[in-house]
Each structure stands twice: as structure tokens, then as C-alpha cells.
Amino acid sequence: MNNVASPTLTVRRITTADNAAIARVIRQVSAEYGLTADKGYTVADPNLDELYQVYSQPGAAYWVVEQNGCVVGGGGVAPLSCSEPDICELQKMYFLPVIRGQGLAKKLALMALDHAREQGFKRCYLETTAFLREAIALYERLGFEHISEPLGCTGHVDCEVRMLKDL
């Protein structure tokens, strides 16, 4: 009988040392789905290489998923810019193919929503694209509802799917 070591998965808060690795994950997954910078997706965000600094702000948090010491995914939550103070945004949920289908996106989203509640947010907004069918299905299962108009000023002009959840 062969012994197969199962990969060690860890979900933890982002550190400054994770900036380059999570930016690579986001760029790789974005390229996989054709989510290019010219269309206003996350890869166009000027702070993509500084996520630790972004999510060190009040009310914000970001988690990375490590497999055997390598960053393979992440996601977070932050106050929604240009919006009511009780609305946060679920942001930058990206996972490499090697860890998809294991429930990590759900686990991370639930952690983010719990954090948002603890920070006093009453609603959580998100934007995504119809290309990400699995993500939309997850958000619907988590209680997010589709809304017609964007909230805040995210700059993600081609994210045509907008959702909101009461916390």
C-alpha cells in the first residue's frame, strides 16, 4: 500500500510577505477566465500588489489559503467605498484550480461575513461577472440577492452581477 500525504491547507490572515504571491494568484485566475485589466476587473486595481496594506485598514480583513506553504487562494472584506457606512464589500475571492471544490471559498466567505458583522456592518455587497457561475451559485447559497444597480465606487465597470446580503 502506498502512503499518500494529504496536502496541508491553512487559512490565515494576510501578511506583508504574501503580497506578491496573492497578486500572482489573482492574475492567474483572472487570465484563466479572461478577466482583463482593460475591462475594469480586479487585475486593474492599482493596489493589487499591496493587499496587506489595503486590508490593514479599519474594518477590513483578508485571508490567504496556503497549501503546503504556497499561497493558492484568498478573499476578504472591506468597507464599501463611496457608500453608506454600514455596507461592506466581499472582495478578491480567488482560488487556483488545485484547491477548488473543497469548500474553501465557502469557509473563507463565512469568515469574512462573520468579521463584517463583528465590525458592525449591516449589509455586504459584492460584484462579479456571469463568467464565474460557480461563485454566483455559492453567493446565492450564502443568502446574497441580486440587485440591479451598482453600489459604491469600485471601478469594476464590467462586473455585471451585483449582489447584496443583509448581515
UniProtKB/Swiss-Prot annotation:
Gene3D superfamilies: 3.40.630.30. InterPro entries: Acyl_CoA_acyltransferase (IPR016181), GNAT_dom (IPR000182), NAT_camello-type (IPR050769). It is an enzyme of class 2 (transferase). The keyword Acyltransferase applies. It comes from the Bacteria. Belongs to the acetyltransferase family. Residues 9-167 form the N-acetyltransferase domain. GO terms for molecular function: N-acetyltransferase activity. Pfam families: Acetyltransf_1. This is Uncharacterized N-acetyltransferase YjgM. Keywords: Acyltransferase, Transferase. Its EC number is 2.3.1.-.
